[in-house]
């Protein structure tokens, strides 16, 4: 016999207060503190009730209603999920990994007897950078990054991280072998 989850009692004003505050937060560009602002709003709207705070976090971050709600409140909750789940997830990602590389693209140009690469890097936080390299600079950059991976291998956490990307390392090896055979 399955038990029906208990119905959570939430003041109707909580949904209005939450919606108003979330609209205010996301009316400006998402930055490193946006997720913290979201956390503060949830804690304030929960008025010290940990169970309610957990419910609101799960609802807004993962789109899940962990407990039953009355029909009207369920509709309000679904509306908040539709409006704010994605911006909240983006804010969380920027908060946790904002400076990490999100995307890299390169274009190759021929310039006076040499190949030049226009490398565009986009970070999780949306900032973009242009890095121009030629073949020699590209090799220097690869050598530097490979030495960083070798350094990571000497650290237990780094070694574990490298084991997790073994397929990528095998692919790199194959690419290096292909490059050295053709030169």
Swiss-Prot record:
The superkingdom listed in its UniProt entry is: Bacteria
One Pfam family assigned to this protein is CT_584-like
The record's similarity note reads:
Belongs to the chlamydial CPn_0803/CT_584/TC_0873 family.
Provide the protein name.
Protein CT_584
Species annotation: Chlamydia trachomatis serovar D (strain ATCC VR-885 / DSM 19411 / UW-3/Cx)
Its taxonomic placement starts with: Bacteria, Pseudomonadati, Chlamydiota, Chlamydiia, Chlamydiales
């Amino acid at each position: 016999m399955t038990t029906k989850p208990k119905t959570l009692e939430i003041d109707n004003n909580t949904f209005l207060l939450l919606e108003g505050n979330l609209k205010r937060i996301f009316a400006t560009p998402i930055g490193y503190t946006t997720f913290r602002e979201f956390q503060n709003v949830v804690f304030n709207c929960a008025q010290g009730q940990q169970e309610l705070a957990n419910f609101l976090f799960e609802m807004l971050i993962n789109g899940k209603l962990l407990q039953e709600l009355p029909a009207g409140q369920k509709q309000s909750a679904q509306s908040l999920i539709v409006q704010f789940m994605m911006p909240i997830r983006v804010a969380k990602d920027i908060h946790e990994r904002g400076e990490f590389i999100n995307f890299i693209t390169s274009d190759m140009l021929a310039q006076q007897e040499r190949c030049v690469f226009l490398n565009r890097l986009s970070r999780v936080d949306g900032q973009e950078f242009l890095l121009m390299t030629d073949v020699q600079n590209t090799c220097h950059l690869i050598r530097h990054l490979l030495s960083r991976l070798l350094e990571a291998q000497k650290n237990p956490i780094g070694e574990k991280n490298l084991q997790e990307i073994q397929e990528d390392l095998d692919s790199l090896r194959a690419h290096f072998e292909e490059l050295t055979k053709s030169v």
